[in-house]
């Protein structure tokens, strides 16, 4: 029943939350599945040469000292290469520059609107209404899928900025459970929309840090008198199962490679380690500091004044108004009445509006927002990584290696694409699958520029994929890195004795029982092999990272060791190339493909929403799919609210439970641990 677990993302980032106990970073949900490493994991062959590749130093795998002349030569080679030697400011920003339409362009747009389908028509002077709530997917969604899609949300902001029928945006902001990377992307679109000169009004009922961070970027922010204020700060929580396992009779045998790897800590320790405390403290500092800076910039208040307000523990929404953090206290209908007055709508008439779903159907072509002849492929990779599609997989919920590889190859074999962007939102997963995708991305990067764009998280297997790109772009608060490995095995002798269970093993081969004899501790020679396997997996990962980032191994070792970094810190340590969102990745792709930055390009989404019957049914809801869909949703919710415990279920029970012989015992353990909650 025992199973060797070599985790590229072994630690579970505990949830960052406000004192209201809601998750503000949703990191536990992001780290839902670890990256499992196969002991037979093998190194891919030599790298082919291409004008798009980095110039890799031979010293990447050589720790021997070199003369200053040699080092200076390497430095000059990197600068000539134009990748490793570049600073963030050397890359194009990709910021939106609003362009006023000339008379001919306005005429063409109005003419096209006359022939728009009825469901794509919008009344002149309409207000685009959108509600931000809960999870926000980085994947495209079909009309059959509920929930928000970041690509469609972003597109709606751009269309509304140029649509002469749209007077402004009324944005309702409800509690969010997405990561800070997506929050930064949405905030950027709010700020870009304001460049059009149109208004954007925010409305917030439950004021947490994420919600206010978005709301304060609007022209005006309103709240009802009964609104909740949870601007109390940030906390990080970590849970440990060492004491639980001790009582149950389970003895975890953990070998971690990298002092910041903490998944093993969750299983074997009863308290947080100094290294994990250090890492989480830095992550917390980065998030809090970024929030204070953003609010200070948006409100025009001094950073220390904002921090002092947080430390007062204000819960009355009236205090936010007095401090100038919101415009006014009004009910939703009062805000609508205000908008009617501003737009000159008669009192007995309704405010003309168009909602998010309908406006998503408005074609960019109608608004004259089509791209140019040059095409850039967008390949979206979101969710945990696996080689093949599972029976409960839903569209966009996982990265299926065989499917993604097919898309990557189609881009590589096609001559119509000038560049490609891999949009990654993944905590990792299967190591073999990660390596296979890394290989395909590397081959693609040898034929045309490839830019990796990171969303909320691109750690472990997610970072593994990104390493193959010609350049990596991440948000300030993207969680990335996590270059490290942990091995975990469980000895169940005491548990078996407690429940009266016995297991006899007959084997052939010296190490045949390494992964199957959980009724006893490892023998010395087995423990040695166990450790060597983990060391080998770690060295492969670390050395490939060093090679990909043109960094000596000893330098990569300093930033690896399983440590998770924010995008900002990852950039200062050479793990990524630039800080920004998808728009910046597109600008860098144009630059590397020798496309003028002011020239329009056509973005081709290869990860289109599925229209197959099973996928449509899975998007409709649990009432159609049945128990499996319902249980999957429940597990997702537990992962968010319970943090490490549900995460542990994903590591221990999901992986070990695949062994049919282990299933009865696993079920008993699940029932027992569930009763302890």
From Swiss-Prot:
Source organism: Arabidopsis thaliana (Mouse-ear cress)
Disruption phenotype annotation: No visible phenotype under normal growth conditions, but mutant plants have altered response to long-term high-light acclimation conditions compared to wild-type.
Tell me the enzyme class: hydrolase
Q: GO molecular function terms here? A: serine-type endopeptidase activity
Q: Which family does it belong to?
A: Belongs to the peptidase S49 family.
Induction and repression of expression = By high light.
- Keywords in alphabetical order, please: Chloroplast, Hydrolase, Membrane, Plastid, Protease, Serine protease, Stress response, Thylakoid, Transit peptide
Listed under GO biological process in this entry are: proteolysis; signal peptide processing
Q: What is this protein called?
A: Serine protease SPPA, chloroplastic
What range is the organelle transit peptide?
Answer: 1-68
NCBIfam families attached to this UniProt entry? SppA_dom
Entry-linked SUPFAM superfamilies: ClpP/crotonase (SSF52096)
Gene Ontology cellular-component terms for this entry are: chloroplast; chloroplast envelope; chloroplast stroma; chloroplast thylakoid; chloroplast thylakoid membrane; mitochondrion
Fetch the CDD domains from UniProt. S49_SppA_67K_type (cd07018), S49_Sppa_N_C (cd07023)
In residue numbers, the region (Disordered) covers: 63-94
Q: Where in the cell is it found?
A: Plastid, Chloroplast stroma; Plastid, Chloroplast thylakoid membrane
The UniProt entry, under InterPro entries, shows: ClpP/crotonase-like_dom_sf, Pept_S49_pIV, Pept_S49_SppA, Peptidase_S49, S49_SppA_67K_type_N, S49_SppA_C
Lineage, top-rank taxon, reads: Eukaryota
Where is the catalytic site? 460 (nucleophile)
Record bears the keyword Protease? yes
What is the recorded function of this protein according to its Swiss-Prot or TrEMBL entry?
Serine protease that may be involved in the light-dependent degradation of antenna and photosystem II in chloroplasts. May function during high light acclimation in plastids.
* Gene field: SPPA
Q: Where is the composition biased (Basic and acidic residues)?
A: 70-90
What Enzyme Commission number(s) appear in the record?
A: 3.4.21.-
